[in-house]
Amino acid sequence: MINIYTDGASSGNPGPGGFGVILHSGKHYKEISEGYRKTTNNRMELMAVITGLESIKNPGQVIMIYSDSKYIIDAVEKKWVFNWVRTNFKDKKNKDLWLRFLEVYKKHQIQFTWVKGHNGHPENERCDELAVQASKQMNLLIDIYFEKEELKLNL
């Protein structure tokens, strides 16, 4: 089994943000993080999960994802995201990331475990640390889809 621990953070919503991921299986351990200049907490939570899953090269893996994001866990476990696909994400945010998530989701056997954030869970705390550090980097990435959508709303 592969364990993926994730967290996302943003300073302001929207604002600078980042995500942190830990992949752990047996002796293998990897940390990943990235920061964006303008994004939202939910986008960073979702990017953490996507990045973790996209890091797994062999399909058909049994994966446990640990997240403190009810947004993601409820969307998948309560099947909301599959209904959003049927309605072409009408009035829903983060379509680009949900479609990207679904591409990797179908390649594996995935389960989610909710962990309470900022409650002493070592891997969640480390992912939070990675996410916050990433959001404070000098050369932040551009969340192109988000910034383009936000620009449309403000025109």
What are these regions (language model features)?
Residues 1-47, 53-61, 129, 137-146, ...:
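RNase H-like nuclease fold core
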